[in-house]
Amino acid sequence: MAGAKEIRNKIGSVKNTQKITGAMEMVAASKMRRAQDRMSASRPYAETMRKVIGHIAQGNLEYKHPYLIEREVKRVGYIVVSTDRGLCGGLNINLFKAALNDMKQWSAKGAKVDLALIGNKASNFFERHGAKVKAHVAGLGDNPSVNDLIGSVKVMLKAYDNGEIDRLYLVYNKFVNTMVQQPRVDQLLPLPVTEDSKLAKKHHWDYLYEPDPKQLLDTLLIRYVESQVYQGVVENLASEQAARMVAMQAATDNAGNLINDLQLVYNKARQASITQELTEIVSGAAAV
C-alpha cells in the first residue's frame, strides 16, 4: 500500500485537476449560450433559404443552372466542419465516422473523394489517413463570420464548376440539445429537391425572375451554399461547447469520486501506520 504522504499528494493533485475541469465546465456553459444565440438567429434564414432552393429545384425553369443538374458521379466533394480543440467527448470522432461511412459508399461505386476541411481536428484526422485535401481553414474562434469561410467554399464551388467534383456534401454536428449532437451529411450540390413531398404535389414552384434567371440564380445559389456552410459551422460550434460542458462535468464528478476513494485509502494507510507504531511501542515496552 502506498504511504500516507504519497496518497495525500495524489489527493491534492486530483483536487487541482477538479478545479480546472470545473472552471472549464463553467466557461463552456457560457460559450454554449452565446453559440446557441448565434445559431438560433441564423437558423430561420438557412432553413427558409433551403426551402426556397428546394422549390426552385422542382420548378420548370427556362434557364437550367448547372447546380440544378444531376450528372454522373465520378468524384465527390465534402466540406467537413470540426473543432479546433479537443476535450469535447466523442463529438469529432462520431462526425468522422459518419463522413467515412458516406465516403466508403461512394468509393464502392468507383467515385473519388476530395475534401475541404474546417477545424484542426478534421485536418489532423484526414491528412493522417491520406485523404486528398483541397482546402483547409482553422482558427475561426467563437464568433465566425461568413467571410472566414468563403475561401474554402469557393475552392469547392470552382471544382464543381470545372467538373472536378460531381456532388458536394456538408458534414457537421447538428445541435439538438445540450445532451444530443447529431452528425449530419447534407447534400449541397446538385441542389436537393424539397423534402415536403405533399407540398410539392399540390404546387408547381415556377418563379418569375428579375432582371433575368441566370443573373439572379448565379448569385442566389452561391449565397445558398455559403449560408448552409455557415449554419453548419455555428451548429457545430454550439455542439462543441455543449459536448465540452458535459465532458468537463463528467470529469469533475469523476474527480470527486476519485478523491473520495483516495481519502478512504489514505485513512486506511494512516490507520495502518498508527497501528504499526503502537505495536512497536508495546513490543519495546514488553522487551524492557
Curated annotation (Swiss-Prot):
Principal location class: membrane
Coiled coil: none
Any one Gene Ontology molecular-function term assigned to this protein's record: proton-transporting ATP synthase activity, rotational mechanism
Keyword Magnesium annotated: no
UniProt xrefs under Gene3D superfamilies: 3.40.1380.10, ATP synthase, gamma subunit, helix hairpin domain
Presence of keyword Ion transport: yes
Location(s) in or outside the cell: Cell inner membrane
Membrane topology: Peripheral membrane protein
Keyword terms: ATP synthesis, Cell inner membrane, Cell membrane, CF(1), Hydrogen ion transport, Ion transport, Membrane, Transport
GO BP field: proton motive force-driven plasma membrane ATP synthesis
Domain of life: Bacteria
Gene Ontology terms: cellular component: plasma membrane; proton-transporting ATP synthase complex
Self-association and partners: F-type ATPases have 2 components, CF(1) - the catalytic core - and CF(0) - the membrane proton channel. CF(1) has five subunits: alpha(3), beta(3), gamma(1), delta(1), epsilon(1). CF(0) has three main subunits: a, b and c.
Alphabetical list of HAMAP family matching this protein: ATP_synth_gamma_bact
Family: Belongs to the ATPase gamma chain family.
Role: Produces ATP from ADP in the presence of a proton gradient across the membrane. The gamma chain is believed to be important in regulating ATPase activity and the flow of protons through the CF(0) complex.
PANTHER family associated with the record: ATP SYNTHASE GAMMA CHAIN, ATP SYNTHASE SUBUNIT GAMMA, MITOCHONDRIAL
Protein name: ATP synthase gamma chain
Organism this protein belongs to: Aeromonas hydrophila subsp. hydrophila (strain ATCC 7966 / DSM 30187 / BCRC 13018 / CCUG 14551 / JCM 1027 / KCTC 2358 / NCIMB 9240 / NCTC 8049)
